[in-house]
Swiss-Prot record:
This is Putative integrase ORF241. The active site is at R119, K144, H191, R194, H217, Y226. Residues 82-241 form the Tyr recombinase domain. GO terms for molecular function: DNA binding. Keywords: DNA integration, DNA recombination, Viral genome integration, Virus entry into host cell. GO terms for biological process: DNA integration; DNA recombination; establishment of integrated proviral latency; symbiont entry into host cell; viral genome integration into host DNA. The lineage of its organism: Viruses, Viruses incertae sedis, Bicaudaviridae, Bicaudavirus. Belongs to the 'phage' integrase family. The keyword Transcription does not apply. Transmembrane segments: none annotated.
Length: 241
């Protein structure tokens, strides 16, 4: 079968024909890109691809990289708390207006993580608790060590019927998706949002014991070591300028 013959067959083939996938495989093997596109259009795949491209363009416009570069030996991408909060709040409002799911929920969860200084799985559980109960302030069991920690849902985050779909996604799968989303669009890992709050509070003179209580750290020395390391790195950068 030559290329022109296959084109004629596809033109007259019903959209639901089982043969169409067989012809798609043949066109790919032969390297006939125009026929592959022709079949994709017939199957509606072309529209799906265009939708994904449009979504990517929207996300790139409203989200900006927050990571300033990974600090060697740590998980920290040097995210500024104030800048991150401004970016995520603005992005959430715009996504809320366009109803761009699931990214709207991803940004809401990242914002919850940022303002609570929590782990991504804790932010996911907090978001799900909010969707189910409507409560904005509640206690959750921390991901590590099982400590009980207080969580707050920012006022900007609203309840929406479309968010119920998030309740059906396993926490581990959802956290993996959000981690990929953050790395792609924010150029930072999700844990950097937790570090951003710690740095912000330390710079504002908050007692390490209070910071540990806010962020759910069991060991105070972890907070002290991290803040001292960050201060030392910033001092070296200033000296090098």
């Amino acid at each position: 079968m030559d290329k022109d013959e296959l084109k004629e067959i596809i033109k007259n083939l019903p959209d639901n024909s089982p043969k169409i996938l067989e012809y798609l495989k043949l066109a790919k093997e032969k390297g006939w890109k125009d026929i592959v596109n022709m079949i994709a259009q017939k199957l509606g795949l072309e529209e799906e691809e265009k939708k994904k491209t449009d979504e990517t363009d929207v996300l790139k416009k409203i989200l900006k990289p927050l990571g300033k570069g990974k600090i060697k030996g740590t998980w920290d991408y040097s995210v500024d708390f104030v800048e991150a909060k401004k970016t995520l709040v603005s992005a959430y409002k715009q996504l809320y207006d366009t109803n761009l799911m699931p990214y709207e929920a991803y940004v809401a969860i990242l914002l919850i993580q940022l303002v609570n200084g929590c782990r991504i799985r804790e932010a996911i559980r907090a978001f799900k608790t909010f969707i189910e109960s409507g409560e904005r302030e509640f206690q959750l069991q921390a991901q590590k060590h099982g400590n009980i920690r207080f969580m707050i849902i920012p006022d900007v985050v609203k309840k929406k019927a479309t968010y119920n779909a998030v309740l059906t996604i396993d926490d581990e799968k959802l956290s993996a998706r959000i981690r990929m989303f953050a790395l792609h669009y924010l150029k930072a890992n999700t844990h950097s949002l937790r570090y951003a709050l710690i740095s912000y509070l330390a710079k504002n003179g908050i007692d390490p014991a209070i910071i540990a209580k806010i962020t759910g750290h069991k060991r105070l020395d972890r907070i002290i070591t991290y803040t001292q390391t960050k201060d030392a790195i910033e001092m070296l950068r200033k000296l090098a300028d």
